[in-house]
Regions:
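Bacterial N-terminal signal peptides that target proteins for export
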Residues: 1-7
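Bacterial N-terminal signal peptides
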Residues: 9-18
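Signal peptide processing junction and immediate N-terminal pro/mature segment
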Residues: 20-30
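Acidic, low-complexity proline/glycine-rich segments
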Residues: 33-77, 156-160, 225-230
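Active-site-proximal alpha-helical scaffolds that flank and shape metal-associated catalytic sites
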Residues: 49, 60, 122-223
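Alpha-helical bundle segments that constitute or directly flank the non-heme di-iron/ferroxidase center
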Residues: 62-73, 81-115, 180-198, 258-263
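C-terminal, helix-dominated tail/subdomain
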Residues: 166, 216-223, 240-256
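Acidic, carboxylate-rich catalytic segments that either coordinate divalent cations
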Residues: 245-281
Length: 282
């Protein structure tokens, strides 16, 4: 009995000692190595690498175009509208230009959707086309508040410099790859939305338009939920298909330059006379 008891005591002691002996520290598992991303090489070997490359490419493009974005933000037209010194007819000319732009972009986005969207996959471009379709009646509402019906908007003669943007979008629809298309709009929509938000604020606070009258500007001022992630995925798929970063950068640079064209043209005289009326002042 004593021997058995002693054996039990020794066994328990060994167990207790074992539980208090510090174990040899394990080396932390290093994170998997990040793939080397060369932004001068076309394509990507896999979708995960393409996703990393898409983000890196957009970061690079945004840095490259930062100066142009600042020009877009600081065009004299916006400051003048905020100061209340721009005639309503000239502001209405922006809407008249947008009438041509929206109708053109709607067709271009529809063409892109036919090229790149899939029934059970991406609907990125069809969503953009649907957005233009929603914006058009809002634009007509603004036109009605300044005395312009759709016939008057259609009769307006656009300024060439204000229409370089939709011409480029049509070119993207016909000739670009999906990565170049998605990157161009991802980089562009942010600053366009900022300027539309400033117009909305000035039209409300300075010119006295009611919220329902300027819903068109509100529509484009608000960011699209999930837009960046959706665009990055389309860019990644395009890179996986062999798209070249050089082409993606070029497309984004051109579209942003044409965005600047639009806002600079807004300060020029309207392309043709517009029979506008002023807003009801508070």
């Amino acid at each position: 009995m004593k021997l058995k008891t002693l054996v039990k005591v020794l066994a328990v002691g060994l167990v207790l000692v074992g539980t208090h002996v510090p174990s040899t520290p394990r080396e932390a598992t290093p994170p998997p190595p990040q793939p080397h991303i060369n932004l001068d090489v076309c394509g990507a070997p896999s979708l995960p690498v393409a996703r990393v490359k898409a983000r890196a490419l957009i970061t690079q493009i945004r840095a490259d175009l930062a100066a142009v974005e600042e020009e877009i933000r600081h065009v004299p037209f916006l400051s003048a509208v905020e100061a209340g010194t721009v005639p309503v007819a000239q502001i209405a000319a922006v809407a008249a230009e947008e009438y041509s732009i929206i109708r053109s972009d709607m067709q271009s986005f529809t063409s892109m959707a036919q090229r790149w969207d899939t029934p059970n996959g991406s609907h990125f471009f069809s969503d953009l086309a649907a957005g233009e379709a929603l914006a058009l009646p809002l634009l007509l509402t603004f036109g009605a508040h300044v005395g312009l019906d759709e016939q008057a908007l259609a009769a307006y003669e656009p300024r060439p410099k204000a229409q370089t943007y939709p011409s480029r979008v049509a070119g993207i629809a016909a000739n670009a790859d999906r990565a170049s298309a998605a990157a161009s709009f991802l980089v562009n929509f942010g600053v366009f939305g900022e300027n539309m938000a400033r117009l909305r604020a000035a039209l409300s606070g300075v010119y006295g338009f009611a919220p329902e009258a300027i819903a068109f500007f509100t529509f484009f001022a608000e960011p699209i939920p999930g837009f960046e992630e959706d665009a990055l995925e389309v860019i990644a798929v395009g890179l996986l298909e062999g798209a070249c970063p050089r082409d993606v950068r070029r497309s984004a640079r051109l579209l942003q330059a044409y965005e600047l064209d639009f806002w600079q043209a807004a300060a020029d005289p309207p392309g043709s006379p517009l029979p506008v009326i002023g807003p009801p002042m508070p």
